[in-house]
């Protein structure tokens, strides 16, 4: 497969030019108007942010994309699926309320919001995975699969379970119904380093599976039979006592996620946008966001989600770590085993390349790309 084209623009704004205008120009240069949207439903997949988290993409960006779709006669809607864990997005009613509190309204985004897998996260469609090795079918939110055109709008950042959260994760994990998320997460479970555990019980409060108990020494213990492997406890721990086990199970989560993403994108027009800004070390699913580990880099767009993620990852690997951050503090620790990899040095024991490898292997796209600046 030949290399794909990824379009890029930075965040510098001369007087009279806004970031929303730069995003519009990026999408036009990347070819969004070559997609036939006339009279068609267009799903715009994004993350509305957990309440308390402020790293998610602003609704203004969504409006740029929705406006472009409407200009082409499309019927756009913003969408995401419900979560496995407790929080403000575990069912459609609370999910919508969360989105609204974070600023996502029709007047601010230019379109309506539909929760992809319905009220309880059970409104799903089981679809085939093209060339799937780990998943022959994928359980995807029905509203997302009912759309004629699929567009992903992604906040690219670090992630405690997958190294980074990019386009493939936004699609693969984000579009999975509750059962679909369970299937992906079932492979990899976190573990506890007892010597670092302070017995604060915060991880147990965050666990939606009641999988964390405390032993006689008041140290956290994870019941591997109950654990869904969602990784929320990793981000909840302030003492780095809970970590993702770097083994075949964790790698399988990454590969399943790629296969789910391929199922969502298969056999219909797709377009992908990724904003590399507010690069927090962990997922936007947390009710807080830590200081960014890297400076804001820019906006990227492509028809190829694999090339897009690779381009964003390469840009992050080349960036200088910020000192007052999880990454900067890790690198400053005496005796730190430096990986020379900003994702692995921020969240050790995570191998992030498996997702891209699997996506390329099953034909979702290519990791080879040409970067064109807009």
Regions found by a protein language model. Give the residues of each.
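Extended, low-polarity segments enriched in aliphatic/aromatic residues
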Residues: 2-61, 71-80, 85-374
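Terminal amphipathic helices with adjacent charged low-complexity linkers/tails
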Residues: 66-67
């Amino acid at each position: 497969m030949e290399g794909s084209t990824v379009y890029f623009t930075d965040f510098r704004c001369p007087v009279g030019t806004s970031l929303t205008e730069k995003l519009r120009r990026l999408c036009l240069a990347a070819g969004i108007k070559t997609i036939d949207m006339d009279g068609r439903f267009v799903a715009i997949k994004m993350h509305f942010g957990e309440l308390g988290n402020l790293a998610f993409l602003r609704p203004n960006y969504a409006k740029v994309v929705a406006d472009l779709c409407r200009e082409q006669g499309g019927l756009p809607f913003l969408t995401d699926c419900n979560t496995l864990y407790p929080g403000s997005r575990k069912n459609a009613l609370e999910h919508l309320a969360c989105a609204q509190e974070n600023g996502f309204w029709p007047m601010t985004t230019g379109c309506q919001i539909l929760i992809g897998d319905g009220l309880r996260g059970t409104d799903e469609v089981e679809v085939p995975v093209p060339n799937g090795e780990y998943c022959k079918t994928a359980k995807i939110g029905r509203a997302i699969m009912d759309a004629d055109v699929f567009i992903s709008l992604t906040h690219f950042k670090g992630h405690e379970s997958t190294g980074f959260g990019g386009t493939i994760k936004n699609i693969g994990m984000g579009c999975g119904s509750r059962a679909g998320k369970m299937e992906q997460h079932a492979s990899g479970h976190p573990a506890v380093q007892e010597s670092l555990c302070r017995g604060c019980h915060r991880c147990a409060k965050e666990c939606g599976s009641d999988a964390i108990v405390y032993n006689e020494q008041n140290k956290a213990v994870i019941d591997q039979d109950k654990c869904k492997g969602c990784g929320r406890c990793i981000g909840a721990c302030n003492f780095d006592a809970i970590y993702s086990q770097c083994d075949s199970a964790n790698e399988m989560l990454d590969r399943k996620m790629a296969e789910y993403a391929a199922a969502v994108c298969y056999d219909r027009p797709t377009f992908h946008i990724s904003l590399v800004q507010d690069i927090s070390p962990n997922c936007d699913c947390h009710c807080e966001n830590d200081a960014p580990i890297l400076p804001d880099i820019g906006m990227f767009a492509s028809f190829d989600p694999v090339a897009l993620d690779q381009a964003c990852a390469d840009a992050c690997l080349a960036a200088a770590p910020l000192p007052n951050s999880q990454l900067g503090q890790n690198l400053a620790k005496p005796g730190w085993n430096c990986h020379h990899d900003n994702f692995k040095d921020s969240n050790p024991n995570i191998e992030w390349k498996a997702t891209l490898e699997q996506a390329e292997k099953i034909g979702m796209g290519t990791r080879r790309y040409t970067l064109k600046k807009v």
